[in-house]
Amino acid sequence: MNNKENDNVIIILPAKSEYVSTARLTASSVSTRAGFNIDEVEDIKVAVSEVCNMILSRTQNKISQYRISFDINTDNIKITFTAENTTLNCFEESIENEYGLYIMKALMDSVELCNEEHSIVMTKRIGV
């Protein structure tokens, strides 16, 4: 098997709900390649869907596309969501009690809703 350390896969999707399945399929492929088992891959797909849906519902047609970056490291995968020409405003307060946030936090090892780059970042460790 090839060395997967520091591989990076980036997709840019139209801000339309029809493309959430594309994000899920990409998450599945990248997570499998990174070495996650089938249950972990499913968890990652669900978490990615939740973030995509959150972005689409919270930005309310203010963006035309968003970017998802999958950073594969030897011991984890980091998934970063950013919007084009704008910031994904800190959703922390507005979704603190939202069910989707609980799902993301339950399925991933860490979830940052507002980092320095105004992105949404999720991390999952391999084999944990």
Could you say what each language-model-derived stretch is?
Residues 26, 30, 43, 47, ...:
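Generic alpha-helical hydrophobic packing signal
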Residues 1-46:
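Bergerat-fold GHKL ATPase/HATPase_c domain
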Residues 1-10, 54-128:
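Conserved beta-strand-loop-beta-strand hairpin that lines the nucleotide-binding pocket
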Residues 38-62:
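Conserved ATP-binding N-box helix of the HATPase_c
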